[in-house]
Amino acid sequence: MKQYWERLRELREDRDLKQADIATLLGTTQQVYSRYENGKNEMPVHHIITLCKFYMVSADYILGIE
């Protein structure tokens, strides 16, 4: 099963977006977002909600809940 940060990377790359683009959307820096996407830091729930809306996917999908 994929980790949520792997799904976030796939969603971003599928849309040809850079980490800096998503960091701006979330109101954070590229460095902080990179740590989320690499699994080094836990992503806050409010960021996950924002990304669900942006990517038009469910939290279940991002979190790998089936």
Give, region by region, the residue ranges found by the protein language model.
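A short, Lys/Arg-rich alpha-helix, primarily the initiator
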Residues: 1-14
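Residues that mark the N-terminal boundary/hinge immediately upstream of a DNA-recognition element
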Residues: 7, 18, 44-47, 58
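DNA major-groove recognition helix of helix-turn-helix
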Residues: 37, 55, 66
